[in-house]
Amino acid sequence: MEKQKNVGHIVQIFGPVIDVQFPNEHMPAILSALEVKINDESIIFEVAQHLGEGIVRAIAMSMTYNLSKGLEVYDTGSQISVPVGKQVLSRMFNVLGQPIDGGKPLDSFIKNPIHAKAPTYLEQKATSEILVTGIKVIDLLIPFIKGGKIGLFGGAGVGKTVLVQELINNIASKHGGLSVFAGVGERSREGNDLYFEMKKAGVLDKTALVFGQMNEPPGARMRVALSALTMAEYFRDYENQDVLLFIDNIFRFTQAGSEVSTLLGRIPSTVGYQPTLSTEMGQLQERITSTIRGSITSVQAVYVPADDITDPAPATTFSHLDAKTVLDRGIAALGIYPAVDPLASSSRALEPNIVGKKHYLVAKKVVQILQRFKELQDIIAILGVDELSESDKQVVARARRIRNFLSQPFFVAQKFSGIQGQFIKIQDTVNNFDELLSGKYDNIPEEAFLYVGTIDQALEKAKKMGWSEKN
């Protein structure tokens, strides 16, 4: 901060936004960081607009309780920058890269600005390697691509955060790479729980966490994903690592952008969102990619307002994703978790030349049976199962077993469910569903397939329920 020369004064304050008067010849650049010092406390702002006559409009990255007109504002001469490199691992940061875990201050470290250009087309690298998650419904029907972007779509309370936490647990412990978690506009309690869960699981030393929670100003929530991405990019570009970037929740990034847009006086677009929605989303998503040096695989939870998948916020996110995992309230209501809707979800990796012919055919047969089961729902509701043809009765019975078998006990939920978490190998998943489709287990009670990892466990559960092979 010794290089600060440019000094302005606050001329207007409205919530988390301030107008600052600078000398005409020394106006700070757009995206520059400004600093206000009050009683040994430093508040950082980011320049968003030039209003003319030396006045700039800036957005706060922290609360603005003690501000008053006339206070001095210092132009730092650079963008907001965050620490990068191995020192950020096992630590928790805010949007400015300041540690918030109560640990010791960082020693000497490198800082990178949070705004950067996306890798050029020539720098990017296409890959078709599958990232095994150990979660049956995902590995079978919606396989994730290493270096791809994955979206977890769902309304409130259907299990997005739990699924993200399970993916962190499974991939970080099995994959062995580095992870960066961005908590964007979600609950502080969830961030706290995640930190201690990761510490307990022994994966914290390979993870950096960055939080801009729902109680923070929109500026912090809008920029925290960029702060986390900057840390991930350093590991990819300078350490040649394969990095996992988890964002919970990408909708809050859009929501914060909408709040900031309104504060800046922009005319809203469709459903009240900012007119720059597609641009802002693109600037973030285009930086999340694989290059010739390393990869970033991104898993993003996407809140769906009022369960409306056509809402502009989730719809804009859709176009950037390689796999779409849709969580359904109806499936959650049946007590089946993860509440993934296999018919609404999709992945561009589900191709025979990527996953193999057997995997592809088994997945397609599973989807066909579930689709036919869905078509029969209205008939069943009106006339009952007894009025169906024998072939349709078989479809219904098999589909119910498949639906139950797509459930799975999670490691991160075992303290609540009392059921040991399961990591299932992808080959076991494919073989188990192949046997299930063949009708080999049509005589086993459908309840036995709920919350088990493999067919063998389902058989054990059935025997405990009083079923025997003579039945």
Swiss-Prot record:
ATP binds at G154, G155, A156, G157, V158, G159, K160, T161. F-type ATPases have 2 components, CF(1) - the catalytic core - and CF(0) - the membrane proton channel. CF(1) has five subunits: alpha(3), beta(3), gamma(1), delta(1), epsilon(1). CF(0) has three main subunits: a(1), b(2) and c(9-12). The alpha and beta chains form an alternating ring which encloses part of the gamma chain. CF(1) is attached to CF(0) by a central stalk formed by the gamma and epsilon chains, while a peripheral stalk is formed by the delta and b chains. One of its GO terms (molecular function) is ATP hydrolysis activity. PROSITE patterns: ATPASE_ALPHA_BETA (PS00152). It catalyses: ATP + H2O + 4 H(+)(in) = ADP + phosphate + 5 H(+)(out). This is ATP synthase subunit beta. Coiled coil: none annotated. Its EC number is 7.1.2.2. It comes from Mesomycoplasma hyopneumoniae (strain J / ATCC 25934 / NCTC 10110) (Mycoplasma hyopneumoniae). Keywords: ATP synthesis, ATP-binding, Cell membrane, CF(1), Hydrogen ion transport, Ion transport, Membrane, Nucleotide-binding, Translocase, Transport. Produces ATP from ADP in the presence of a proton gradient across the membrane. The catalytic sites are hosted primarily by the beta subunits. It is a peripheral membrane protein. It comes from the Bacteria.
